[in-house]
Amino acid sequence: MDAARMIEERVGGDIAELASMVDPDQEGWSRVALTEVDVEGRQWALKQFRRLGLDARIDPAGNVIGCLQGAIGGRSIMVGSHVDTVPGGGRFDGIVGVVGAIE
């Protein structure tokens, strides 16, 4: 299998896994902030960051933060997104940014 196909399958799998974490009592794809499924999504992101070797944590506000230490004095790259969705949000609400950051 070529590298592009492997990436496609990994990204597709991550999107499907996170998209499956929704509130079954809501329409669409709902992971409303501070609900059980939102916390489940945050824990999923934390696990993914740690799997990649990042120093990862959830801060007091509930933000999932992953850091990979680089060269001292080197440039930094920062990416951000959100695991939660608006009520009844689309399948990719927040997911694309989260999976993009993981990738």
Where do the language-model regions lie?
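Alpha-helical metal-binding/catalytic segments enriched in His/Glu/Asp
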Residues: V79, G89-E103
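Glycine-rich phosphate/pyrophosphate-binding beta-alpha loops
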Residues: T85
